[in-house]
């Protein structure tokens, strides 16, 4: 059965739940330590957040039980009308385009997200000390934690996404696969290391240095590309201090400055299905868009996808034409912030409009509807998160970027092993071009 996509204004979509926490709401009481609503919803389908009351062992057992659950129900093209109020336009479009193969398994909701207590202590301090620029495009000051647990603007929500807890220093072992409608798969194996200086607890002031985020990507395979690398020094004040980047060229065995990668710059490893500011779903400057904080809404979103931690995203059993197998997915009902970004008239970007859905418990963007210059839904992004005890916290196990017009999709996923989370900063100089060159020569 074909299902047509109904274009629904965002303000109508927010009728399910559209509220911003009042300033009087207290962190750790009505709100969780990161600013989510602690209470469940009226019908009990979203439970109260209580992950802070569990020991590490009890939380681990909880996660193990989750992996053994069966779906409460499965949404198909045949019963879609019953559930469409909980779905993003991108998901509705997937049903319209692929009614025979696409479905959504919906499981019980578990609010498993939590993070170290010391980050909670700093988040409370950020209520007084965190600051953004007048334009909202730069983060000027914050202690190690979410800057804005009670956001009043869309920019504050997006800065929360960009600075959310992901550990201090991370080494990720990933597979990246472009999947075409004929199931031709083009894959890369990479190691990505990132360091967020924001979470350095030795800082004596909330004021932020211009260089604050460090990123290095190293290609392991295939053989024709192995050895190449990309180093980025990024900024939380990107208008004053734009990012710097270098590439490592295997044949030359040296680092070379490269044009800054940002906004809608193409990324070679995704065949144009993902642009530079879509790394981590969204990253970098906010200045090319006008931002609107629409409110909060209950939605069905990918969540607690523990099994994806151990599945390669080039596994043929998980791949179908146009999308991954629904059997690999887990959706739950959660509350999200809804943020709309519209391209400014005097700015350039291939995406005219984007709607971001941000999980209230983690501040991670989990879904994105992306529109072209004609305001047609063009692309759709999903983040499948899992809980990582080593972090500890929620982190992406798979990001899926769909081109709804040509049918191809790009996946970035955990390799299942080799990913490490560190609670302390890397050695001094670890992310300098000289250090990278020395390590790559070994």
Question: Residue spans of the language-model regions?
Answer:
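Bacterial N-terminal signal peptides that target proteins for export
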Residues: 2-10
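Residue-level detector of alpha-helical hydrophobic segments embedded in or interacting with membranes
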Residues: 4, 16-18, 28
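Solvent-exposed N-terminal domain segments of exported/luminal and surface proteins
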Residues: 27-243, 249
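Extended beta-strand-rich segments in extracellular/periplasmic secretory proteins, especially
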Residues: 171-221, 279-356, 366-368
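Sec/Tat signal peptide C-region and signal peptidase I cleavage site
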Residues: 20-24
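Long, C-terminal catalytic modules of enzymes
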Residues: 417-442
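Gly/Pro-enriched, hydrophobic low-complexity segments
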Residues: 28-52, 66, 75, 88, ...
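Bacterial N-terminal signal peptides
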Residues: 9-19
């Amino acid at each position: 059965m074909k299902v047509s996509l109904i274009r629904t204004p965002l303000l109508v979509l927010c009728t399910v739940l559209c509220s911003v926490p009042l300033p009087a709401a207290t962190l750790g009481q009505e709100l969780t330590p990161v600013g989510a609503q602690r209470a469940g919803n009226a019908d009990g389908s979203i439970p109260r957040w209580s992950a802070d009351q569990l020991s590490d062992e009890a939380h681990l057992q909880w996660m193990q039980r989750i992996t053994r659950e069966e779906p409460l129900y499965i949404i198909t093209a045949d019963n879609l009308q019953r559930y469409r109020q909980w779905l993003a336009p991108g998901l509705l479009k997937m049903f319209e385009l692929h009614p025979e193969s696409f479905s959504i398994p919906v499981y019980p909701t578990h609010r498993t997200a939590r993070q170290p207590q010391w980050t909670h202590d700093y988040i409370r301090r950020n209520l007084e000390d965190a600051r953004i620029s007048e334009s909202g495009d730069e983060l000027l000051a914050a202690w190690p934690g979410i800057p804005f647990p009670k956001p009043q603007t869309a920019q504050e929500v997006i800065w929360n996404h960009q600075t959310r807890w992901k550990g201090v220093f991370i080494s990720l072992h990933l597979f990246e696969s472009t999947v075409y409608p004929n199931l031709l798969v083009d894959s890369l194996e990479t190691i990505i290391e990132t360091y967020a200086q924001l979470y350095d607890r030795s800082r004596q002031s909330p004021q932020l240095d211009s260089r604050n985020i460090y990123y290095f990507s190293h290609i392991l395979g295939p053989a024709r590309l192995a050895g190449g690398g990309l180093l980025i020094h990024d900024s939380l004040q990107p208008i004053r201090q734009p990012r710097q980047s270098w590439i490592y060229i295997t044949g030359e065995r040296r680092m070379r400055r490269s044009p800054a990668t940002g906004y809608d710059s193409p990324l070679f490893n995704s065949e144009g299905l993902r642009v530079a500011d879509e790394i981590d779903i969204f990253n970098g400057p906010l200045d090319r868009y006008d931002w609107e904080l629409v409110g909060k809404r209950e939605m069905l979103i990918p969540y607690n996808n523990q099994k994806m931690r151990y599945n390669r995203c080039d596994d043929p059993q998980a791949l179908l034409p146009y999308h991954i197998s629904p059997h690999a997915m887990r959706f739950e009902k959660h509350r999200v912030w809804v943020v709309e970004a519209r391209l400014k008239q005097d700015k350039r970007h291939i995406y005219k409009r984007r709607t971001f859905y941000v999980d209230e418990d983690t501040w991670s963007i989990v879904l994105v509807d992306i529109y072209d210059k004609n305001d047609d839904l063009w692309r759709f992004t999903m983040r499948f998160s899992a809980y990582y005890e080593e972090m500890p916290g929620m982190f992406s196990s798979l990001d899926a970027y769909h081109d709804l017009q040509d049918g191809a999709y790009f996946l970035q996923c955990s390799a299942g092993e080799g990913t490490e989370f560190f609670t302390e900063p890397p050695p001094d100089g670890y992310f300098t071009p000289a250090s990278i060159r020395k390590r790559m020569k070994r």
